[in-house]
Amino acid sequence: MKKFLVFICFALAFSSKAIGKETTYSKELFDKALSEGKVVVVSSWIKYCSSCAGQMEVLKKAKKDFENMEYFAFDVTNKEIAQFFNVQYQTTLLIFKDNKEVYRSIGETTKELIYDALKSSI
């Protein structure tokens, strides 16, 4: 029961950061999306980060233009997830296709460059 309550608190804390179709990262959902052949976009953020907010705004718009992709976000202070993706900085953007990482950027907030990366992943 204690583990369940900890899990619920953890889920609620991180789910508040999801925007639009973006989902707080979970390994199970990430693996499922990849196994279904979807292009997966993963972004990292941290509270009070202006470049993170800028990138999230671009991704929020991109979700409408690239609806066939799956979007996940995680707080970069979550060391387990950060290590899994080898992410050391907030505003890191990753794109996966065919079970492989095909794009990585750090600090990119320019709509044109993010859209180019998304288009090249289709």
Task: Give the ranges of each region predicted by the language model.
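Thiol-based oxidoreductase modules, predominantly thioredoxin-like and allied folds used
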Residues: 44, 67-80
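Short active-site neighborhood of thiol/selenol oxidoreductases, capturing the structured segment around
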Residues: 35-47
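Sec-dependent N-terminal signal peptides
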Residues: 4-13
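N-terminal leader/targeting and pre-domain segments
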Residues: 10, 18-37, 120
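Typically the conserved alpha-helix immediately C-terminal to a functionally engaged Cys/Sec
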Residues: 52-65
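Non-catalytic, surface beta->alpha helical segment in thiol-disulfide oxidoreductase systems
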Residues: 97-122
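Structural micro-motif
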Residues: 85-94
